Amino acid sequence: WLITGARGAGLGIIMARTGDKVEHGRGATMFLTDMDRAGIEIVRDLDTLDRGFTGGHSEILLNDVRIPASDILGEIDEGYRYAQVRLGPARLTHCMRWLGAMNRAHDTAVAYAARREGFGRLIGHHEGVGFQLADNEMDIHMARLVIWQAAWALDNGSDGRQETAMAKVLCSEAAGRVVDRSLQVLGGLGITSDTVVSRIYRDVRPFRIYDGPSEVHRWSIAERLMRQQRKKNG
């Protein structure tokens, strides 16, 4: 399994099937257990594109792991429901991080465009550069509003699944566009370590995969729409 933050972790959450089958959010149980328990092995640390996670990403092998009942987290057979409850807010915190990454890259590009001259004027006044900065500003504004709306839905008692799924797709893909444009504005400087943008560029690409790839979220959004329509049709 590809597990983020496994290296150095003292505790791990393991979800296992405890019912005859997992359906309607029941049948799986969460366990909070020590990572040094017999049978839990970190096989290797993966060399991933990004470097932004404490503990990195590791491949873990579970081999005949025996966990006592005292390690049960919450109630038996409710693990899947617990996981679903935390997914929406967790995805939204990722969106907030990605918004910060977008802003950092964009601010770097704007500052550069406001001091670098080309063909007799600041490059930010050339449409080829200025339009990219304008597109960045709009993507960032959109991402911020999407995050606010999803957070509002959660604060007002909604499970937020549709809102957070849309936010996850929109923000992760916007981050890729914003950082790519920022690097382009910086030109040759952008691919060096002289600015932070090259590192952000590597960090943002996995965002469209972490916590569910964009394709899975698009599928889930569409499925909810179909379920809503079936209810309307009776």
Question: What do these predicted regions represent?
Answer:
Residues 1-43:
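A short core secondary-structure module
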Residues 3-4, 40, 70, 155, ...:
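Conserved protein kinase catalytic core
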Residues 6, 23-25, 47-54, 87, ...:
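Short alpha-helix boundary/capping segments
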Residues 11-15, 30-32, 57-64, 206:
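Conserved hydrophobic/aromatic beta-strand scaffold that supports enzyme active sites
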Residues 23, 34-36, 67-68, 122, ...:
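Short, solvent-exposed coil/turn linker segments
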Residues 36-66:
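Flexible, small-/acidic-enriched active-site or ligand-binding loops
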Residues 59-64, 78-80, 84-234:
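Alpha-helical interface subdomain recognition
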Residues 71-76:
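Cytochrome P450 core scaffold surrounding the K-helix E-X-X-R motif
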